[in-house]
Amino acid sequence: MRHSLPASIVHALLLAAALAVGTPAHAQTDALPSWNDGPAKQAIVAFVKDTTEQGSAKFVPPEERIATFDQDGTLWVEKPMYSQVMYCFDRVGALAEKKPELKNVEPFKTVLSGNREAIAKLGMRDLEKILAATLTGMSVDEFQAQVTKWLESAKAPRYDRPYTELTYQPMQEVLSYLRANGYKTYIVTGGGQDFVRVYSERVYGIPPEQVVGSAGGTKYGYDKSGKPFLTKEPKLLLNDDHAGKPEGIHLMIGRRPHAAFGNSAGDQQMLEYTKAGDGARLAMLVLHDDATREYAYGPAQGLPDSKVGTFPQALYDEAKKQGWTVISMKDDWKRIFAWE
């Protein structure tokens, strides 16, 4: 026995099906559920809609859809110290086991002491010595294995969680949202390119070839069996910070981004470079103003000053002047981490 549905229900089902078919990814569901509905979220949604809808005056061809993201402080926690620096400090202990004489040599002696106040007072030359000793002198494969092993056990002191669990859920949603709408996402970081490439695909869905960072030289050679390998050398090829970011983008990507995201003075030139292009451009800065859920630092807007991820008032003023969007962690993000 056949039963017919009421005409009103049939009409509703047909309408729903018609709306679902061919609907752009940005219009089907809320792709940014961890964002409060405010100017920042609206700016992202409007940008994606304007640049991906056929017939839009601001339409961007798929091959030109490039979005760049700083990592530390933009995609994951950078306090109390950059994760790569924490890795280097931890590696000093392993080095001292192989070379006991380092226990009496500065700055390694200070790091091994565990005295946080003394470590915080180390100068740039001291840090350079530590970075050179822990990031170079081994093969690329050995370095990748060391970083992978460290990430398996290292935890951020405040949260007692692995660093890879301290990515910002709202920014993860932006990455996915952009990719769903044809954007290619890149990490452009002042941190070590080889370091970030170890985990970028697993943590952010960004393959290693789409990571641009501060890069050191390598030397080609052969092991005892004749197998070729690369050795990391203490020679800086690219300082991917401040003006180095647009230089790195040109060198490694070859296209000017249509969207750029950062959080500090080191990202200013990347945002300037992005906005200077023709057509629709999106420039956004994350402001850390939530001491309860994460950290609060600036010193923009009267927030505490910080040597890590400095966001000066001059950058805040420039953002307002240039029409960049400042993302307030406190006001714009419903939650910060996926595990909240």
Give residue ranges: language-model regions.
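Bacterial N-terminal signal peptides that target proteins for export
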Residues: 1-13
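Non-catalytic pre-domain segments flanking phosphatase-related domains
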Residues: 3, 19, 26-71, 86, ...
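Bacterial N-terminal signal peptides
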Residues: 10-22
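A metal-dependent, Asp-based hydrolase signature
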Residues: 28, 81, 86-165, 169
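C-terminal cap/substrate-recognition subdomain and adjoining C-terminal extension
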Residues: 28-35, 39-45, 49, 64, ...
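Short, solvent-exposed loop/turn elements at domain surfaces
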Residues: 53-55, 76-78, 220-221
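Asp-based phosphoryl-transfer active-site loop
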Residues: 65-80, 271
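Short catalytic/ligand-binding loop motif for oxyanion handling, primarily in non-cytosolic enzymes
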Residues: 77, 84-85, 195-196
